[in-house]
Amino acid sequence: MSAILKLLEYCLGRLFYRRRGYDAQLFYKSAAFAKHSSPTIPITSPDCGKTGAILTTEYSKFGSGKIPQFTWPAAAPDVKEFLMLCEDPDAPMGHPNVHGIYCFIPPTVTSFGPTDLELIKEVDGVKVLESGYRVGKNRRNVVYIAPRPPLGHGPHRYLFELVALSEKLDPEGISKVPDKGEIEKAIEGKVASWGLWEATYESTWDRK
């Protein structure tokens, strides 16, 4: 990116700096989590560390753009399925920006990472992953949007929310590419517990 374009982006980033912090619209603030207001599943990242980490360029749009590797303890007996959702509440869009939605993760799984998002093929907008997980909708219609906050907009938070479900989702009961709102409704009455891993990333002048 040229210096002029960077300067323009920086100016816009500063102009819209206060457009951030849409925490009230986060996934875990939806009605489905009414009985589970706090995370109880401990999540860590062998790559990036504990929650509260600062992401390196490697995990951004300016690096490989891969999702961090995550691990968590074995699920309780009542857990029938997991799902994972990643979002940025600091995007200047008036609502959190969804970076990725992944459904139908088996209850025996205790890790999630880049290899789970390997794309085999795409048919009519439906992405087929090696892992078999269903990919939900984000604004770029890709498997995962790597962090790329506007220059000058300060650090953004990236929340990776793992949800343990007491009932499996019906594969035929949700869209082939479900969005966040649809998932929020689909999991009402099914949330057994959930975990949160959060990291920050800020675009800098020395990026490519």
Curated annotation (Swiss-Prot):
A Pfam match: PBP
InterPro entries to which the protein is assigned, alphabetical: PEBP, PEBP-like_sf, PhiB
Chain segments annotated as coiled-coil in the UniProt record: none
Biotech and industrial use: Phomoidrides A and B (also known as CP-225,917 and CP-263,114) are potent inhibitors of Ras farnesyltransferase and squalene synthase. CP-225,917 and CP-263,114 inhibit Ras farnesyl transferase from rat brain with IC(50) values of 6 uM and 20 uoM, respectively. CP-225,917 inhibits squalene synthase with an IC(50) value of 43 uM and CP-263,114 with an IC(50) of 160 uM.
Family the entry assigns: Belongs to the tstB family.
Cited function: Phosphatidylethanolamine-binding protein; part of the gene cluster that mediates the biosynthesis of the antihypercholesterolemic agents phomoidrides which are dimeric anhydrides. Within the pathway, phiB is not essential for dimerization and its function has still to be determined. The pathway begins with the highly reducing polyketide synthase phiA that catalyzes the formation of a C12-fatty acyl-ACP, starting from one acetate and 5 malonate units. The hydrolase phiM is involved in the release of the C12-fatty acyl chain from phiA.
Name the record gives this protein: Phomoidride biosynthesis cluster protein B
Species per Swiss-Prot/TrEMBL record: Fungal sp. (strain ATCC 74256)
Lineage per the UniProt record: Eukaryota, Fungi
